[in-house]
Every structure is written in C-alpha cells, then in structure tokens.
C-alpha cells in the first residue's frame, strides 16, 4: 500500500501541473480583463464582477476545447459567407496596446476580395463594452476607394450582444420588410489571419452609398448621439437644466453630406427641433407634415412596435436623412436592438422621445401608421418574416457548434435563448395584430337627426369611409361639414366634393375619422398613448331633414360593417 501511495505521489505532477498551469492561465487572463475594462476604464452602465470575468474565461476555454474536438471545427467548415481579414501581429498589438482606447484607432491590414488580398484598415467599434470587452470584438473595416467590398467602402462586423444572438440582425431585416431606409445586414463567418473567429453580423455603415443603394438622391444624414463615446456630462445640473437631442442641433453631426450646401448647415433639422419644442401648438402639425415623409414615419413607428425597440430616444440612436429634392426628412434605422426590452405590454405604440410625442399628435402620421399596420398583416409579410426567423435560427444552431468565441459559451443556453426570442417575436406580432384589429364589431355608434349625424369612433383604427342609407331618393347635390374638438378649440371642416358620392338612396363619405388619442407624458418608463372615442358632428346641406336614415355602415379597411345606432351621442 505504501508503495502504491509513493508511486501516486511521484506521478501526481502529471495531474497537478496541468491544473496549476490552466488555473494560473485563467487567473492571469481574468485579472487582466477585469483591470482593463472595469478598473482602468469606466464601463458604466455595463458593469461586470471579477466572478463574471472568471466564469467567462472558464467557459470560453471549455468551448474552445469542444470546438477543437470536432471534425467540422478542426476543418473550420461553415455554410455562411466568409469574410477574411489579415492584420500583421505588430498592428494587432497596436490595436490591443491600451484597450479600449487604442482599439478605436485604425490599424493597417488587408481583406480578401474575390480571392485577392486588398489593403484595408481595421479598428474596433461600438459605444459600450460588450462590443470589445470579450474575445469576440465588434470590428469596423474601411477599404480603399479603388477596392470596394461588395460595393461598400466601410462596413461593420458586429459581435452578438447577448445570448439571443440575433436581435439586431433580425430587427434590421424587419426594417427592410417595411421598406425603410436601413443598412444591409447578413450572417457571416469572420476569419482573422486564417483563424476562425466565429459568427458575426455584417452591417453596412450608413453613408451616401446607403442612399444610392436605396435609389435615393444624395443628401444629408444627421446623426444624434449623446451616449457612450459621444456622451455629454450633465453632472451638477438639475434635471430641468439638462439638454437632449431635440433641444438643440448642436448635439448632432452628419455622416453624409449634400455637397450642394454648406456642410455646417442644419436648417431642416433646426426646423424639426423648433416644431418639437412647440409640439402642443396646433399649427406645428401642418408644418410637420410638410417636412416629414409621413408614410415612411408611419412604417417606422409600426416597425418600432413590432421590434419592441425603444432604442431611438432623447439621447441616443437617431439617424435622419433629408431629401433636398422632396424637402422631406426620413428615418434611417440604425442599431435597433429589437426584442431586448418588453414595452408594456407588447404591441402598444412606442413613444420614447420628444419626436415621438410630436408625431403621435399628427393625424397624417396616425393614418400612415394605420396603413402600415394594415399592409403588413394583410399582405402576409408577418408570416414571411416569421419564416425568416425560423430559418435563421436553424442556420445558427449548426454554426454555433463550431464557434469557439460563442458568448455565452454554452450551445444549449444559446439555442434555448434563440427559441425564446422566436416565441417573443411571435407573441409581439400576435398581440399587435389583436390590439390593432380590436373586436369584430364596428367600434362606431351614431345618432341621426334633422340632416345631421353625431358619430362616435372607438377602437384603435380610424374609420376610412362611411355610407348613410335612406328610405327615399336623395337630391343630386349634397355637401357636408364636419365639426370636432381639438386641443386648440373647435374646428369645422368642409368636406371636398370629390370624397362625397351619392346614389339614389345613399351617401358615401370617403373621409378618415380618428378616435381621440392623447399622450400621458408622465407615464414611465415611456410615455403612453391613451385611446378614447372620437366625437364628430356632420351636417349636410341639400339633404331633406324629413328623410329617415335606414342604416349606417362604416369601413375600417375590412369592408362595410354596420355601425350601432343610439338614442343620443354625447362627447366623452
């Protein structure tokens, strides 16, 4: 027995030495990462503990060993497009010399384009530490003008932000589904100096090229950022003294310039900010409809709802394109980070900035938003996008098996998280559709008396047309006026003759009537849209007051549905 114990002791180094080396390696890497990104650099609001860093190092090492033990991992096989970068070790050392600051300076390297190595510049990118704290770092690549990569000079290789992996990729794909101005994005495999660095998201950097690829004329692209590296300090200021993006154009810059105008000119943006400050003034809404492409903004709002994103806020993440030929501002979707937050509950409008508050008081915007919802669900685009989600997850399930830099480094955990994301998207779509459509009844009530109609419009959708049916033949010439209350007082609108159609026994009004919408500015964390019935009085000229109304149908986009009569209708 003593002999056996002596021999075990003599050979114990075979076990203890590798464990000691591995433990020392993990401790050194953990302390170095924690010191670099948590002590020497202030990473707020994204903080990590020493334990978080140690767990990352252990899990990363285990994932690397798992990948290296598979044939597919050893052969670096992938079904994704490959983007191969080459950076000399000395230049990589320069990038990593004093992280994160050193990483934001371009280093010289190369990129393979059509099998040929072309010169390029590479740096790390991203406002927050999850982009560059870990081994899989987000990268920006800039090629020479004479050697574009798939038509682009500047693009990003973004590392996934969380265990769901696909949030940004899928939300940018959803933006494209809405025909919004958004950067191109693809799932790719990144190789650095011949080594597989795992799954990345190829994302175009917004520029004049983005406009050309969208068949838009060159124009200014304004960028609004006040967080991360662009953060302004308001220390010592009271909350009422702080300033945000829609307080001043001074907080904005340009990422694309119309060279027909002074590069320092921000006139369209300044006009928008003036209107935002006067958002409760009724006259500001007419001016807003003049400078904003409301069809695009309506689609953008629906996109925000379906992507459950509040990432465009008073301090962050705005990109606005100004088309000088049409004189309109368009949203450009950037870094939407979809389905990371869960607005209360999913499916409700997102009102996350002063610009949102202004838009949700604009009737042209509200009608455009309704049209965007109708087109998305009625065209089957929702089902097409859900198929894209399913296909993307299937691709990822194969690719993450050989991603040594997967974070979190747990294939099962990542797979479950992606399927959870899929269910979250399905739920958001279903909830939004149900909330928008409402119940099967018309959602409108009316009372007719003496050639006048009192109408109450309830629900979330506008009435797009109405048809009044009478028991006797009508006169050939009938006009109508609509009376309704606004925050600025009572308004009377003469309906154009072109939207009034008369048949022998009926009148059709092809006018839009909205429910009453108000914004609760005090709600937290986001302002809330409160919906109540809209009250309208319609008076007819040329209509015999003795005629009896036999019925009233309304159309909210589903065809004619009978409205409910009432003995009287009073404003709510």
Locate predicted features:
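Surface-exposed patches in mature extracellular/periplasmic domains of secreted proteins
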Residues: 154, 180-191, 284-288, 318, ...
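Internal "kinase-insert"/substrate-recognition segments embedded within catalytic cores
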Residues: 180-183, 196-299, 393
């Amino acid at each position: 027995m003593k002999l056996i114990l002596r021999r075990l002791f003599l050979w114990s180094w075979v076990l203890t030495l590798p464990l000691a080396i591995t433990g020392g390696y993990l401790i050194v890497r953990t302390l170095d990462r924690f010191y670099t990104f948590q002590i020497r650099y202030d990473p707020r609001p994204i903080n990590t503990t020493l334990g978080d860093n140690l767990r990352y190092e252990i899990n990363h090492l285990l994932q690397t060993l798992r990948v290296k033990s598979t044939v597919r991992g050893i052969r670096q096989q992938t079904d994704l497009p490959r983007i191969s970068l080459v950076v000399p070790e000395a230049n990589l050392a320069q990038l990593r010399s004093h992280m994160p600051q050193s990483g934001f300076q371009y280093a010289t390297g190369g990129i393979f384009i059509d099998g040929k190595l072309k010169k390029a510049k590479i740096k790390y990118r991203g406002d927050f530490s999850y982009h560059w704290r870990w081994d899989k770092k987000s990268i920006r690549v800039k090629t020479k003008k004479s050697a574009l990569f798939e038509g682009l000079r500047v693009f990003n290789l973004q590392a996934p932000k969380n265990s769901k992996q696909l949030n940004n990729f899928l939300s940018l794909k959803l933006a494209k589904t809405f025909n919004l101005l958004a950067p191109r994005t693809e799932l790719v495999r990144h190789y650095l100096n011949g080594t597989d660095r795992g799954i990345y998201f190829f994302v175009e950097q917004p520029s004049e090229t983005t406009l050309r690829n969208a068949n838009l004329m060159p124009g200014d692209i304004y960028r609004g950022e006040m967080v991360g590296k662009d953060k302004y300090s308001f220390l010592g200021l009271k909350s009422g003294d702080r300033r945000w993006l829609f307080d001043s154009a001074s907080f904005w810059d340009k990422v694309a310039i119309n060279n027909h105008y002074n590069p320092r000119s921000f006139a369209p943006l300044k006009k928008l900010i003036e209107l935002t400050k006067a958002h409760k003034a009724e006259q500001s809404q007419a001016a807003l409809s003049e400078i904003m492409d409301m069809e695009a903004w309506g689609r953008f709002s629906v996109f925000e709802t379906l992507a459950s994103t509040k990432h465009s806020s008073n301090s962050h993440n705005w990109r606005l394109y100004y088309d000088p030929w049409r004189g309109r501002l368009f949203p450009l979707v950037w870094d939407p980070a979809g389905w990371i937050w869960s607005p209360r509950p999913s499916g409700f409008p997102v009102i996350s900035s002063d610009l949102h508050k202004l838009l949700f008081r604009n009737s042209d915007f509200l009608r455009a938003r309704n049209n965007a919802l109708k087109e998305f669900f009625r065209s089957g685009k929702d089902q097409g996008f859900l198929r894209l989600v399913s296909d993307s997850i299937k691709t990822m399930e194969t690719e993450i098996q050989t991603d040594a830099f997967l974070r979190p480094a747990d294939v099962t955990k990542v797979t479950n998280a992606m399927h959870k994301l899929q269910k979250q998207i399905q739920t958001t779509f279903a909830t939004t559709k149900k909330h928008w459509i409402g119940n099967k009844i018309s959602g409108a009530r009316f009372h007719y008396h003496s050639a006048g109609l009192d109408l109450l419009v309830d629900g979330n959708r506008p009435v797009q047309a109405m048809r009044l049916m009478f028991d006797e033949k009508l006169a050939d010439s009938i006009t109508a006026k609509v009376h309704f209350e606004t925050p600025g007082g009572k308004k009377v609108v003469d309906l154009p003759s072109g939207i009034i159609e008369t048949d022998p026994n009926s009148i059709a009004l092809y006018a839009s009537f909205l429910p009453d919408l108000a914004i609760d500015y005090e709600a937290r964390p986001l302002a809330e849209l409160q919906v109540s019935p809209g009250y309208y009085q319609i008076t007819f000229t040329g209509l015999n007051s003795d005629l009896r109304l036999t019925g009233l149908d309304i159309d909210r986009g589903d065809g004619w549905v009978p409205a409910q009569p009432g003995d009287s209708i009073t404003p709510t």
